[in-house]
Design a protein with these regions (language model features):
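ABC-family ATPase nucleotide-binding domain "signature/switch" substructure
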Residues: 1-9, 17-22, 27, 31-42, ...
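Nucleotide-activated donor-binding/catalytic signature segment of Leloir-type glycosyltransferases, i.e.
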Residues: 46
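C-terminal boundary and immediately downstream tail of ABC-type ATPase nucleotide-binding domains
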Residues: 150-184
Length: 185
C-alpha cells in the first residue's frame, strides 16, 4: 500500500518493539529498524528498555507511555515509506516535552510526501504548506498558517483562543505576528 496512518490512539501488536516497527516492512533489516527509530526519536527510550528492540510488548503496548507508543507508530510509518500519510490527532493528549519529540519526528516523516493532518492542537499544523479549515463539514478557509492569521477568520480565532488557554507551545506563539491583536467576539 502507498498509504500510511499515524493515529491518536496507537495500536501495538503482541511481539517485540522491533516487530512493531517492522510490521509494514517484514523484511526490514535491523539497521533499517534502528534508523527508523532514530528518526522517530524513539531509539534512546528503546535502548533503555530491558531488552532494547527485543523487549516484548503485549497487544496495546500497555507497558509503554502514550508518547513512546506514538514514536513507535511514527517509526513504523517511516519504515513503510508511504507516498500518502494521514496523521489523525498524532500529538493529542501528550505533554509538551513529548509533543516536541514527536513534532520533530513528524517533520522528518512528512518531508517529500502528501500528508493529510487532522488536528485540534493547531501548533502541530503551523509548518504545513496548505491548511484547510472546516466549519460544519465545509471548507471555510484555506491558506498557509501566516495567511490564515492575516485573514483573521475562523483559524485566527481558534489560534488566539488556544494561545489564551495556554494550549499553544511557546515556540508556536513566537511565530504569531506581533501586529495582530487578539480577535474580538
Amino acid at each position: 500500500s502507498q498509504m500510511g496512518v499515524v493515529l491518536q490512539e496507537t495500536f501495538l501488536f503482541a511481539g517485540t518493539i522491533r516487530d512493531n516497527i517492522a510490521y509494514a516492512c517484514p523484511n526490514a533489516t535491523d539497521e533499517m529498524v534502528i534508523e527508523a527509530a532514530k528518526t522517530a526519536n524513539a531509539h534512546d527510550f528503546i535502548m533503555d528498555l530491558p531488552q532494547g528492540y527485543n523487549t516484548a510488548v503485549g497487544a496495546g503496548g500497555h507497558s509503554l507511555s502514550g508518547g513512546e507508543k506514538q514514536r513507535i507508530a511514527i517509526a513504523r510509518a517511516i519504515i513503510h515509506n508511504p507516498k500518502i500519510l494521514i496523521l489523525d490527532e498524532a500529538t493529542a493528549a501528550l505533554d509538551t516535552e513529548t509533543e516536541k519529540l514527536i513534532q520533530d519526528a513528524l517533520k522528518k516523516l512528512v518531508r517529500n510526501r502528501t500528508t493529510l493532518a487532522i488536528a485540534h492542537r493547531l501548533s502541530t499544523l503551523r509548518n504545513a504548506d496548505r491548511l484547510l479549515v472546516l466549519d460544519h463539514g465545509k471548507v471555510a478557509e484555506f491558506g498557509t498558517h501566516s495567511e490564515l492569521l492575516e485573514n483573521r477568520g475562523i483559524y485566527y480565532k481558534l489560534v488566539m483562543a488556544q494561545q489564551k488557554l495556554g494550549a499553544m507551545p511557546k515556540e508556536a506563539e513566537k511565530k504569531l505576528p506581533e501586529a495582530l491583536p487578539a480577535a474580538e467576539g
